Amino acid sequence: MNVKSTNISWHRALVDREMREKLLGQNGILIWFTGLSGSGKSTIASELEMRLYNMGRLTYLLDGDNVRHGLNSNLGFTKEDRIENIRRTAEVCKLFVDSGIITISTFISPFKDDRDKVRKLLGKDFVEVYVDCPLEVCESRDPKGIYKKARNGEIKDFTGVDSPYEVPDNPEIVVSTNLDTVQQCVNKILDFLSCKVQE
């Protein structure tokens, strides 16, 4: 990461990550959902968060749309803005993970290079969940009506229509929302996480 300011230094806190995780009784981790719009990322992530909450786990869900209302409100959907959207979000996720929180993020994050940068930043704390769903199924769901707008030319650079989605090469978890129920998808994720979040 290129830091423009040259007169700053990193200050170490007296309370470190290990102490925070011990206090919470859990390990901080980032569960990064990626997939087309309408694939079911937010639905599965919300159910996952509720299940973890009911298990007594401290979580935080960063939804791609919600983050664009605040932190990333000055970004559009050009390739450059999408890259910056993911970069900023990854840095926030890193802070949450360092605080011992099970962090769940739901971003289309269509570019492999961007996701690889998040993986590099988080290291062993990064779990990529690819929400696999055929484009035609996502379009038929179209909960926000945005595929229709994209097909009508009202939205430019829309992932899956006139901007590519690069399928992950080797995600930790793949869930198929056109084949499995939300509960089945969540169970699959929880099975994978069972040994990772336990302190």
From Swiss-Prot:
GO biological process: hydrogen sulfide biosynthetic process; sulfate assimilation
Pathway field: Sulfur metabolism; hydrogen sulfide biosynthesis; sulfite from sulfate: step 2/3
GO MF, one annotated term: ATP binding
Key words, A-Z: ATP-binding, Kinase, Nucleotide-binding, Phosphoprotein, Transferase
InterPro entries from the UniProt entry: APS_kinase, P-loop_NTPase
Catalysed reaction, written as an equation: adenosine 5'-phosphosulfate + ATP = 3'-phosphoadenylyl sulfate + ADP + H(+)
Highest taxon in the source lineage: Bacteria
Amino-acid positions noted as binding ATP in the UniProt annotation, renumbered to this chain: 35-42
Keyword set includes ATP-binding: yes
Keyword ATP-binding belongs to the record: yes
EC number: 2.7.1.25
Residues annotated as catalytic: 109 (phosphoserine intermediate)
Similarity-based family: Belongs to the APS kinase family.
HAMAP family per the UniProt record, alphabetical: Adenylyl_sulf_kinase (MF_00065)
Protein purpose: Catalyzes the synthesis of activated sulfate.
PANTHER family linked: BIFUNCTIONAL 3'-PHOSPHOADENOSINE 5'-PHOSPHOSULFATE SYNTHASE (PTHR11055), PAPS SYNTHETASE, ISOFORM D (PTHR11055:SF1)
UniProt protein name: Adenylyl-sulfate kinase
Organism: Clostridium kluyveri (strain ATCC 8527 / DSM 555 / NBRC 12016 / NCIMB 10680 / K1)
Gene: cysC
